[in-house]
Structure formats: C-alpha cells, structure tokens
Design a protein with these regions (language model features):
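Glycine-rich active-site/cofactor-binding loop and its immediate structural neighborhood
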Residues: 102
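C-terminal nucleotide
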Residues: 1-94, 106-166
Length: 166
C-alpha cells in the first residue's frame, strides 16, 4: 500500500552504467558507497522483518544517496528532480530499479500521502505504473503468432489443462 512505481521516461543502457561502476570501484568514495548500499540492504531487511516501515522508507533514501555516488551515470537532473519532488510531497525514500540511468523509480511513502506523491510525480512527467507482488517469482510470456491457433486456446497449468473453443 505504500510503494509507488513510476516510469521516468528515460531509456538507458545498463551495461554502460555497470562498466562505469566497475571503473570507479577503486575510487574511495565509490567503494565506500558500494559498501553502504550492501549494509543498507541488510538494515532494510531487518526493518521490514520488524514491521518498521517508516525506517525502511528512510533507509531507501540513504541507499539512493549512496548509489548515486557509485557512478555519475546512475542519475540525471530530470530523475533527481522527479525524486526530490516526490520527497517534498511526502515520500520517505526511493530508488531507481536496476542499474540506474532511467527506467522505473520506486518510492516509499506513508499511505496518507501516496496520492499526493503520485500526482506530483505525474505533474513532473513521470508515468505511474500499476503493479502487484508476484508470489510465484518472475513470470514471463512469449507469444509466437505463427504457432497461434485463433480457433481455440489451450492453457497448461500444474493442476490441469484447459481448452477454450473460440
């Protein structure tokens, strides 16, 4: 109930960001930031297990500030402004998913300001995305139109097969 997912509109190549992080590995500030991100992941897990969601949100912000120090390619002025405006609207913290550089921004906010944060992010050009937790792990679909029979649909599930005539 407290997480928002916002598409930043930025397209990026993750490999370039990761290469830059590897290059920066030997720099003290970038290395310290990597260590902080790792420590924060453990701290966030502990806060979630304790049910302390407010602290979890604040730790997300610490993590984002640390991640940005790992490479100058992780963020850009548009992403920073989107993030900062979400914080001003009441979000406690957030992060770009994946390597950074664009894609989706995940924000944690108290439920009573969630709609205010979402509205502000949309005003700033972000695109809010609907999402749900998937308890079965990552799911993917592949559609091969050449093999598709438009007269019937068959679904294979662990507990049985289903066939639908169209």
């Amino acid at each position: 109930y407290n997480l928002l997912l916002c598409y930043t509109g930025n397209i990026h190549v993750s490999a370039n960001i990761i290469k830059d992080q590897v290059k920066n590995y030997e720099k003290k500030d970038a290395f310290d930031a990597m260590c902080e991100v790792k420590a924060l992941a453990y701290a966030m897990k502990d806060e979630l297990l304790k049910g302390n969601l407010h602290s979890f949100g604040k730790l997300l912000d610490y993590g984002w500030q640390s991640k940005k120090r790992m490479s100058s390619k992780i963020t850009n002025p548009q992403i920073d402004e989107l993030y900062d405006e979400a914080i001003k609207a009441g979000a406690l913290g957030g992060k770009l998913l994946g390597a950074g550089g664009g894609g989706y921004l995940l924000m944690y906010c108290p439920y009573n300001v969630k709609h205010k944060v979402a509205a502000r992010m949309e005003q700033m050009g972000g695109q809010m995305a609907d999402w749900n937790f998937e308890l079965r792990g990552a799911q993917s679909w592949i559609a091969d139109e050449n093999r598709w029979n438009y007269n019937e649909v068959k679904v294979h599930l662990p507990n049985g097969d289903y066939e639908f005539k169209l």
